[in-house]
């Protein structure tokens, strides 16, 4: 259903509390909201959410089409006279990396000196919001000071790539994901630039096990962990997220990934 713009936060809270009260949080494999919807049925789930919105009018769902899953990285107008800056965060890790981006220090300094709010995106990037035009130079200076990369210099593939956390955090993981994908993307970048595809948004996702928390099954290239340093390769999804990929190879060794994907990119 749809709600008016001013009721969006209330609707989101109703959805979250419905999942909290009706979802199975004791069994991790059955904890996600999609299983709650499957168990209750979409009509019952919708009715429960609406019940939690007393006095708020809801409207029939409209047809909605997403053309991309890409975040609007970089600087953009917010629509109210202010700006927002969407910052690429490698694998979603807000940490200070040795000899690399100091994400944590940058965001801490921005919060302390400019008191700006943050929004975390589904692609695990960070949007710095409510920036006054006169603050733009200060934000740029702080990001540059802490070596936070500018998205303009990245391939379109790197901008949209995503991995689940996997090892060592997740006990279900069979192989690396978050810690492996940056290196895989380096290899992709080399091939993409060689073939002139650096501006084509080719969706690459990696997950540490078949549960697929990294959403590999609708990516152009999805790598699904099977065993240490071994992945199943799924090919043929889309940047719009509206097409499932198919299993191409049951096992690809980590060191063979670049050689395996090159023929697909050359085709």
Q: Where are the predicted features?
A:
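Peripheral terminal and linker regions in Fe-S/redox and tRNA-modifying enzymes
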Residues: 1-267
């Amino acid at each position: 259903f749809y709600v008016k713009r001013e009721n969006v936060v209330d609707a989101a809270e109703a959805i979250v509390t419905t999942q909290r009260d009706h979802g199975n949080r004791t069994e991790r494999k059955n904890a996600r909201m999609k299983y709650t919807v499957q168990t209750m049925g979409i009509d019952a789930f919708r009715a429960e959410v609406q019940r939690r919105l007393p006095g708020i009018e809801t409207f029939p769902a409209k047809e909605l089409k997403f053309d991309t899953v890409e975040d609007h990285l970089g600087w953009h107008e917010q629509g109210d006279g202010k700006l927002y800056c969407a910052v690429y965060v490698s694998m979603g890790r807000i940490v200070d990396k040795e000899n690399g981006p100091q994400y944590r220090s940058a965001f801490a300094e921005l919060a302390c000196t400019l008191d700006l709010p943050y929004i975390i995106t589904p692609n695990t990037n960070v949007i710095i919001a409510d920036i006054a035009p006169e603050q733009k130079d200060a934000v740029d200076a702080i990001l540059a000071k802490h070596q936070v990369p500018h998205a303009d210099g990245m391939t379109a593939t790197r901008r949209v790539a995503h991995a689940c956390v996997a090892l060592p955090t997740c006990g279900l993981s069979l192989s690396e994901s978050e810690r492996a994908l940056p290196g895989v993307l380096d290899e992709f970048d080399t091939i993409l630039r060689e073939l002139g595809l650096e501006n084509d948004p080719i969706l690459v996702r990696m997950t540490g096990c078949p549960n697929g928390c990294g959403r590999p099954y609708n990516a152009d290239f999805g790598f699904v962990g099977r065993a240490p340093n071994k992945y199943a390769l799924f090919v043929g999804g889309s940047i719009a997220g509206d097409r499932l990929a198919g299993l191409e190879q049951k096992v690809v060794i980590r060191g063979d990934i670049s050689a395996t994907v090159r023929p697909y990119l050359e085709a």
